[in-house]
UniProtKB/Swiss-Prot annotation:
It holds the Pfam family p450. Probably involved in steroid hormones biosynthesis. One of its GO terms (molecular function) is iron ion binding. Its cofactor is heme. It is found in: Mitochondrion. Belongs to the cytochrome P450 family. Heme binds at residue 480. PROSITE patterns: CYTOCHROME_P450. This is Cytochrome P450 12b1, mitochondrial. GO terms for cellular component: mitochondrion. The keyword Transmembrane does not apply.
Amino acid sequence: MWKFAIHSQQPFCWQQLCNRRHLYVGNVQQQTHLELLDAAPTRSDDEWLQAKPYEKVPGPGTWQVLSYFLPGGKQYNTNLIQMNRRMREWYGDIYRFPGLMGKQDVIFTYNPNDFELTYRNEGVWPIRIGLESFTYYRKVHRPEVFGSIGGLVSEQGKDWAHIRNKVNPVQMRVQNVRQNLPQIDQISREFVDKLDTLRDPVTHILNDNFHEQLKMWAFESISFVALNTRMGLLSDRPDPNAARLAEHMTDFFNYSFKYDVQPSIWPYYKTPGFKKFLQTYDKITEITTAYIDEAIKRFEIEKDSGNECVLQQLLSLNKKVAVVMAMYMLMAGIDTTSSAFVTILYHLARNPHKQRQLHRERRRILPDSDEPLTPENTKNMPYLRACIKECMRITSITPGNFRIATKDLVLSGYRVPRGEGVLMGVLELSNSEKYFGQSGQFMPERWLKADTDPDVKACPAARSRNPFVYLAFGFGPRTCIGKRIAELEMETLLTRLLRRYQVSWLAEMPLQYESNIILSPHGIYVQVRAAC
């Protein structure tokens, strides 16, 4: 879940800073050599020699691309889903998006065999470009704070593996994440209690403030995991530092879109706006570090109080690791989780029959709505988890997965040299009849392994047998590290909300999305009424 997409009005390759043998990290003068690219031998086998040359990959020319995205162009004001769909219609299942402003090309592919080849050949150090501004901030602007500790989004090669290997056991272990359930449940209860203030008293339609408050729910939840602190963001009197941090996180998303996604001259000239961005990073670092320092004092007093929380385990590795990971969790775990939850709510609101089936499962788990959620009573929630997977199949907030090829590859019959960017259009395939029967239907039953109710029959035949067609959280060593936390948060809030309410979609048109760092929903015409 914690992945960043790109704005469709700006070509994807504007984000890529690779040439075929070197990767420039952070758009800075310092060049990070990825030895694995040079170490991979040049191919001379029959498959490679018989494949079509890279230059023959279909696709638009540079000026044609520019015309697409200018006002009046065919792709102007389209979101990422629309852009992918149109380009595929025009150029087929593989095409080359030309590099602009000195950047490299990117290969877009919609062939699951290409997905598998790319993933299977990425090695132990997969390369995926992340937030370049954060790399610059850590390595150039504030090296005295972060030292050699890198972030999961922005590091590559050995540096990435070093931090990932440290934090994997902390954030991917089920019991580590599930120990946060009591507090995550309490936060979800507080949000559901607040719903009456977020809907019209007569029509019961959610108001414009709903999504912003949902972000505060996501912020409150992830900050407890990252900082072991309740911020009070759902109350009328949040902690002053928490309120400041929330404002700075909003600024971060706005600045990141402008300087990490859109074309910018900041790598060559530090504009006043980019300097404000660095100040925002400073404030986030300052407040995050202060919360961690408070937690350290608290942990000293509460020694031997039971299982160590996520923050304690990160601190046992290194305080700098804890600061970097806390910042990463905050940056990656707010808009992504809240936007995904809106999408889930939308699909359930449009499918009342499935919602009723889910409500029956909720009542079995919580006969008494005031009963707390526990690891025991949340083990058996197959239909809820199937609903979440089906929502993410139909509308993922990150409709593609990106990698730099670390070996020479043959994709769909074309040579793709190592060092080239490859964008795998997963969302297009997961909405295709070729891979999912009745792909246009909301059918959670396709994800069930067995019948869960006399009226709920498993239908695995409607699910693709190819595991590379549905990859909501990525694949391999760079699988989304926030997967388990995001799932816990969404499962908990969905359980609480649908135990008390039923939701309906009132608009004629489907939910709309706009592209930012991720695909963000807007125009949420959901009615929330008391459940029968």
